[in-house]
Amino acid sequence: MLTFIGLGLYDERSITVEGRDALRAADRAFAEFYTSTLVGTTVEALEAFHDTPIEVRERAGVEQDPEEVLAAAENDDVAFLTAGDTMISTTHVDLRLRARDRGVETRVVHGTTAQAAASALTGLQNYRFGEATTLPFAYAHGADGLPASVTETIDENRERGLHTLVYLDIKVDNEAAVARAGDEELEEYMTADTAAGYLTETYPDAPGVVVARAGSPDPTVAADRLEALADGAFGGPLHLLVVPGDLHHVERDALADLADAPAELLD
């Protein structure tokens, strides 16, 4: 049995009760933190909280050579852990399909997603979001300006009046994920002000909404023009950015109240 368990958004307590029970019942637990990570905890704290040893896998050990995970699941109850919800990433869907091809029974225990939290914290209605996109670090996509994948997604959503959730790039070495070292060489998180600065070059007058540390005790939500957000400071990671489309009157009220949106942004 291979059980995919979403750990939620922030720390060792963000997991659901169902996920906690499944993890504690597993014979063996694997995790990966390169697609996303829990900035409010460490692997050591997760292990202590759940009284379960956790083996952290490198990217190659999940995407290219998952044999150890699959072989273990053929004979034992294995838990595979990720931040957020495990089935948001194509990598994890692929791992599940590989397991099923080998006759391994699979199960999914969902966790809270960043998209659900962004909608809840901002008051932007979930069904009014279009396709999401990821904004990489400038050095990561090897070209000047914004990647076409980002601009095309935002443009298509805006044409339809839909909001765009922009995931911001992270680079986390497994050593940092385990120790939460804070070493700049081991972990790097794009901030919302940096992302707003990138987007301002193409969308100088567009509004934006920052969501920082969703799932933590002290989340930050702020709405303004992207050029204004580019000069802001929103505290520690993880950050998300939303580029709103057309706003329902309840969404306008929510942004004014929950995100301190200036009146001129909502006209």
PLM regions: where:
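Class I S-adenosyl-L-methionine
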Residues: 1-105, 109
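Beta-strand/loop-alpha-helix module characteristic of Rossmann-like adenine-cofactor folds
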Residues: 2-5, 116-267
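Short alpha-helices
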Residues: 83, 93-95, 104, 110-125, ...
